[in-house]
UniProtKB/Swiss-Prot annotation:
It comes from Saccharomyces mikatae. GO terms for molecular function: ATP-dependent polydeoxyribonucleotide 5'-hydroxyl-kinase activity; double-stranded DNA binding; polynucleotide 3'-phosphatase activity. This is Polynucleotide 3'-phosphatase. GO terms for cellular component: nucleus. PANTHER family: BIFUNCTIONAL POLYNUCLEOTIDE PHOSPHATASE/KINASE, BIFUNCTIONAL POLYNUCLEOTIDE PHOSPHATASE_KINASE.
Length: 245
């Protein structure tokens, strides 16, 4: 099927220290207190996983699938149920991507990740239930610090929208979980989107919970997700809690 002239539902922004996908036409429906309810998630091994059994990382852009913690419903089904049942819901994904380098943007790892998320978003859009979820879904990823910054101490040329971070040598660390930089950018982007839409910004972002698999348990590779939730002062939930009904 031809898609010429068809606007993609999300716009991607690739910075040296951050990758984000924001809806082109975001939808905000406030609750009675003029608040948005934020449901936040990790991505890998929380919402999706590689198709290859027992694999930790995706081998290609299409090597992923939605997870099933419940035999009856996939993680995508649960995301759809959130936006179906909560009109004030906004879903945001925060993901550390230590294997992705965005300098240059044409790097193999960056291209693979961008294509992977594009396919992820396409899977949502192609589902008849996607029209509610897609305009309320935001995705943020923290890539790896490029070696050139570390070894040659070269100054990165930042786009105009983030020149204020030019002289911040810790910006790469600040956007990686458990630090809260990605959430800070999300707050800014929500406010900016409201201004573009000529909509009154929400009085408050009501963080319902943050869900991730890196909780410092015996078999977990990290505790970055649970520490991230603590720094945000947000309730933490394991994927098994959210996606098993």
């Amino acid at each position: 099927m031809k898609t010429e002239g068809r606007q993609m539902p999300h716009k991607s922004t690739i910075l040296p220290f951050l990758i984000k996908f924001a809806p082109n036409s975001p939808q905000f429906t406030y609750d009675c207190d003029q608040c948005l309810n934020v449901y936040a998630f990790d991505l890998d091994h929380t919402i999706i996983k590689p198709k290859s059994p027992n694999a930790k990382y995706s081998r290609s852009a299409n090597d992923w699938q939605f997870m099933n913690f419940d035999s009856k419903k996939s993680t995508l089904d649960y995301l759809f149920s959130i936006t179906d049942n909560d009109l004030a819901a906004v879903i945001v994904i925060f993901s550390n991507q230590g294997g992705v380098i965005t300098v240059p943007r044409t790097s193999k790892s960056c291209s693979k990740y961008i294509n992977k998320i594009s396919l992820f978003l396409k899977a949502i859009e192609n589902d008849k239930r996607g029209e509610k979820l897609s305009p309320r879904l935001w995705i943020y990823a923290a890539p790896k610090r490029p070696k050139t910054v570390v070894t040659n101490n070269k100054k990165i040329t930042f786009p105009s929208l983030c020149k204020s971070y030019n002289n911040d040598p810790e910006i790469f660390e600040k956007v990686r979980k458990p630090m809260t930089g990605m959430a800070d950018f999300f707050r800014i982007d929500i406010t900016d989107a409201c201004r573009v839409l000529k909509t009154v910004p929400p009085i408050k972002l009501n963080w319902v919970y943050y869900c991730g698999d890196a909780a410092g348990r015996k078999n977990d590779f990290s505790d970055s997700d649970i520490k991230f939730a603590e720094k945000l002062h947000v309730e933490f939930k394991y994927p098994e809690e959210v996606f098993q009904g």
